[in-house]
């Protein structure tokens, strides 16, 4: 399994709740700082991360994302 963290910038107050509805997002919560929410994703293959981040970027109000992949 491959785990990644997606940082999301969005002015929407409920963006963390919306992120939980995205397929393969295991957890999501609001954060303070440069970004507004974090989505934790877990996939079978590294290439699937792009599919999940593309879904997140298509959400209305998402301004930008940054993805960090777990290194083992």
Question: Which residues are covered by each model-predicted region?
Answer:
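A compositional/biophysical signature of low hydrophobicity enriched in polar/charged and small residues
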Residues: 1-72
């Amino acid at each position: 399994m491959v785990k990644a963290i997606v940082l999301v910038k969005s002015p929407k107050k409920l963006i963390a709740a919306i992120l939980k509805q995205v397929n393969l997002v295991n957890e999501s919560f609001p954060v303070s700082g440069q970004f507004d929410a974090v989505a934790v994703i877990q996939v079978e293959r590294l290439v699937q991360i792009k599919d999940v981040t593309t879904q997140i970027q298509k959400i209305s109000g998402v301004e930008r994302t940054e993805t960090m992949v777990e290194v083992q």
